[in-house]
């Protein structure tokens, strides 16, 4: 009988979110604009959204996020609007920074994977709502109302990070570390129930 099953990809994903969040918040606490912008740059590279901001606009983009840090923390920043004067959209990139800084409010990252997963979720319950960036926050709030979990404060952040992973990764084959009778095994599958032991 299995004592414990851990999803390797989930733990890695959640850990990275915690690390990035800590780096952003530490930079804000120290009023270190350079460290903040460096972290934003690294997030863009690691999460493959750097390309959504043209090279000539990257400095301005990171500067804008730094100037918007308090608005993001106070959930007064809207990432899904386009300002002609700033010449960039980068909706998913901005959503990721908002989510990391203020997960209790923003709750889910806006990107293609989560959009697809939410669209499929609403189809499965015969809800015809349109899932798009304009209605994203409203849709996310409604989605969370269907979960047996309602984030209230910072003690819920780890769970929020996990919910984000579980949504976009639900159709992804994962690696499971299984501790069984004092031994460790590795399995692959969509879920713990369907996972099969790796064979050499």
Sequence positions of predicted segments:
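An N-terminal alpha-helical hairpin/helix-loop-helix interaction module that forms a charged
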Residues: 1-86, 104-200
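Short hydrophobic alpha-helical segments that form membrane-spanning helices or hydrophobic packing faces
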Residues: 93-99
């Amino acid at each position: 009988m299995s004592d414990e099953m851990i999803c390797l990809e989930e733990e890695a994903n959640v850990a990275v979110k915690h690390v990035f969040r800590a780096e952003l918040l530490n930079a804000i606490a120290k009023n270190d604009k350079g460290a903040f912008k460096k972290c934003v740059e690294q997030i863009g590279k690691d999460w493959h959204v750097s390309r959504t901001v043209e090279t000539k606009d990257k400095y301005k983009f990171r500067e804008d996020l730094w100037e918007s840090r308090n608005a993001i923390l106070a959930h007064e920043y809207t990432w899904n609007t386009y300002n002609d004067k700033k010449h960039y959209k980068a909706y998913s990139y901005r959503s990721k920074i908002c989510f990391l800084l203020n997960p209790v409010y923003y709750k889910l990252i806006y990107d293609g994977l989560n959009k697809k997963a939410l669209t499929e979720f609403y189809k499965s319950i015969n809800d015809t709502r349109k899932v798009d960036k304009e209605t994203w926050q409203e849709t996310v709030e409604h989605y969370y109302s269907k979960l047996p979990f309602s984030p209230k404060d910072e003690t819920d952040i780890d769970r929020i990070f996990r919910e984000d992973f579980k949504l976009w990764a639900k159709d992804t084959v994962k690696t499971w570390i299984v501790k069984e009778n004092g031994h460790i095994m590795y399995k692959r599958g969509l879920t713990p129930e369907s996972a099969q032991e790796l064979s050499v």
